Amino acid sequence: RGFFSVYALWKNKASVLVGDYLLAKGLLLSLENKDFKVLEILSDAVKKMSEGELLQLEKSRLLNITEEDYFSIIRNKTASLLASACAAGAFSASQDDALTEKLRLFGENTGIAFQIKDDLFDYGSADVGKPTGNDIREKKLTLPLIYTLKTTSAETRRKLIYIIKNKNKDKSSVQFVIDEVKKAGGIQYAEEVMASYKKAALDLLESFPASEARDALSEMVTFTTERKK
């Protein structure tokens, strides 16, 4: 965020092809080096990311997403990428299954915290690299809004759902949703959940010996949850 993406520079067709090329290159490198475990890790990540995106598309259409659904989506579509990167690196360096699983879980917790932080930007200022209320306009129900829909009055819930379904392009209506989420404590709730995943990630790191690598990973977790954009 803050830099031009491949899509911004070359639009959809080129960006999809670049992504396919990089994926194919990574899979081929694993095969050439007979890193079959790494190949399995990467292939599983692609499967999970696809499943996460498909589930999000379905739930955006039906608007019946639960908190459990939300975590299934972000665990698959976002966290699995970082989890697989950590697992692949761990196995390549150690061939230790227990160590690989521990770092995979570290990556997953960090990835979940990253996505919650990203979702919180939708309710903040407009200078973070994505428009405020963009998730609402795209009918994406994220953790702050899911919490609000679960805890608010039936009347307010009906109004919020109506706006998301029918008036999600109207600026004042989107702002009403944002205000209701803030009023209901949805932001605070999401921040607390994010902090719990951050702590889980850092606790896993503490089980490793002190090193520059551990410090760098710790700084990454902190950056993930405290970034401004």
Where in the sequence are the language-model features?
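All-alpha prenyltransferase/terpene-synthase fold signal
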Residues: 1-229
